[in-house]
Swiss-Prot record:
Coiled coil: none
MF-aspect GO terms: large ribosomal subunit rRNA binding; structural constituent of ribosome
Family recorded in the similarity comment: Belongs to the universal ribosomal protein uL11 family.
GO cellular component: cytosolic large ribosomal subunit
InterPro entries in alphabetical order: Ribosomal_uL11, Ribosomal_uL11_bac-typ, Ribosomal_uL11_C, Ribosomal_uL11_C_sf, Ribosomal_uL11_N, Ribosomal_uL11_N_sf
Keywords from the UniProt entry: Methylation, Ribonucleoprotein, Ribosomal protein, RNA-binding, rRNA-binding
Gene3D superfamilies (alphabetical): Ribosomal protein L11, C-terminal domain, Ribosomal protein L11/L12, N-terminal domain
Protein name: Large ribosomal subunit protein uL11
Designated gene of the protein: rplK
One BP annotation, GO: translation
SUPFAM superfamilies on file: Ribosomal L11/L12e N-terminal domain (SSF54747), Ribosomal protein L11, C-terminal domain (SSF46906)
Cysteine pairings via disulfide bonds: none
Naturally occurring in which organism (per UniProt): Mycoplasma mobile (strain ATCC 43663 / 163K / NCTC 11711)
Length: 197
């Protein structure tokens, strides 16, 4: 039986498919960088344009093995939706919709890296990521309801921001008039019941 190699380091990195180059992220691993980049690029050449997560196992003798993973879910969703970035606030801004068939394709693609072998569970997981990015799934999400909720949340956020700005302005005006410091505490609606007790 062959002696098992001693692992000295395990690193998780990400490179564009077929485009890994020697650099600082690899230098710290103590492997022969050109050898890794050649093997990685050969193994990922057909996945052109994809970011490819990779786990590199480094052994004491400076040899290595690596394992490739599927592209990140966010990348696949943005690609399916035809957008460059997700929503900064998915509760108030919906940036795109995708079809249920696209969701299913992404779930099938991601299955090797998910901790489920059930397609429906995988789709549910991917749909959750999509919602967090401001992407809705036709035939899976209630799009009309989600858009209405987003409009309401955006209106509430704008109203709260305007109210807070007015409070800050009023506090600054009081300070200027009195030329002394004062502490201003904002009491939210849900806090009112607790203060009165």
């Amino acid at each position: 039986m062959a002696k098992k190699k001693e692992v000295v380091r395990v690193a998780k990195l990400q490179f564009n498919a077929g485009q890994a180059k020697p650099g600082p992220e690899l230098a710290g691993l103590g492997i022969v960088m050109p050898e890794f980049t050649k093997q990685f690029n050969d193994a990922t050449r057909e996945r052109s344009g994809e970011p490819v997560p990779v786990q590199i196992i480094v052994y004491k003798d400076k040899s290595f093995d690596f394992k490739l993973f599927t592209a990140p879910t966010s990348f696949m969703l943005k690609k399916a939706a035809g957008i460059k970035s997700g929503s900064a606030n998915s509760k108030t801004t919906i940036v795109a919709t995708i079809k249920k068939s696209q969701l299913e394709d992404i779930a099938k693609y991601k299955m090797p890296d998910l901790n489920t072998k059930n397609l429906e569970e995988a789709m549910h997981t991917i749909a959750g990521t999509a919602r967090n990015m401001g992407i809705l799934v036709e035939g899976y999400d209630d799009i009309v309801k989600a858009r209405e909720e987003a409009k309401l949340a955006a209106k509430e956020a704008a109203s709260a921001a305007a109210f807070e700005a007015k409070l800050e302005s009023d506090a600054a005006q009081l300070l200027a008039e009195n030329k002394q410091s004062a502490e201003v505490e904002v009491i939210k609606e849900k806090d009112k019941g607790n203060k009165d007790e």
